[in-house]
């Protein structure tokens, strides 16, 4: 269910704003999006897994807060990230 280390490293390389960047908003949102997509696929086949569902909702809320922060502080980075990830906002 969790993303593998190689997947995580690839996402960090793709969305990092500078070398060694693992904590920028873009990287955090990209990692959360990968987790959310994995959990969404899991929930399609395990409809009664309520514990995972609660975790999914928490991750969605965390991503929403990070996106709201980015939207309020740097709208151009926000728009670029939304387009790159293919999110509907």
From Swiss-Prot:
Which InterPro entries does the entry mention? Answer: Ribosomal_uS15, Ribosomal_uS15_bac-type, uS15_NS1_RNA-bd_sf
Q: Which UniProt keywords apply?
A: Ribonucleoprotein, Ribosomal protein, RNA-binding, rRNA-binding
Organism of derivation? Lactobacillus helveticus (strain DPC 4571)
Annotated function: One of the primary rRNA binding proteins, it binds directly to 16S rRNA where it helps nucleate assembly of the platform of the 30S subunit by binding and bridging several RNA helices of the 16S rRNA. Forms an intersubunit bridge (bridge B4) with the 23S rRNA of the 50S subunit in the ribosome.
Q: Which residues form a coiled coil?
A: none
Any stretches that span the bilayer, and where are they? none
Q: Which biological process annotations from GO are given for this protein?
A: translation
Q: SUPFAM superfamilies per the record? A: S15/NS1 RNA-binding domain
Q: How does it assemble?
A: Part of the 30S ribosomal subunit. Forms a bridge to the 50S subunit in the 70S ribosome, contacting the 23S rRNA.
Instruction: Report the family membership.
Output: Belongs to the universal ribosomal protein uS15 family.
Q: SMART domains in the record, alphabetically? A: Ribosomal_S15 (SM01387)
GO MF term (any one):
structural constituent of ribosome
Q: What is this protein called?
A: Small ribosomal subunit protein uS15
Name one cellular component (GO) term.
cytosolic small ribosomal subunit
């Amino acid at each position: 269910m969790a993303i593998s280390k190689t997947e995580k490293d690839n996402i960090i390389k793709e969305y990092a704003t500078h070398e060694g960047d693992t904590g920028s908003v873009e990287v955090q949102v990209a990692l959360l999006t990968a987790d959310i997509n994995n959990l969404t696929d899991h929930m399609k086949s395990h409809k009664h897994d309520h514990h995972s569902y609660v975790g999914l909702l928490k991750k969605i809320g965390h991503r929403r807060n990070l996106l709201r922060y980015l939207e309020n502080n740097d709208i151009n980075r926000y728009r670029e990230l939304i387009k790159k990830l293919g999110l509907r906002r």
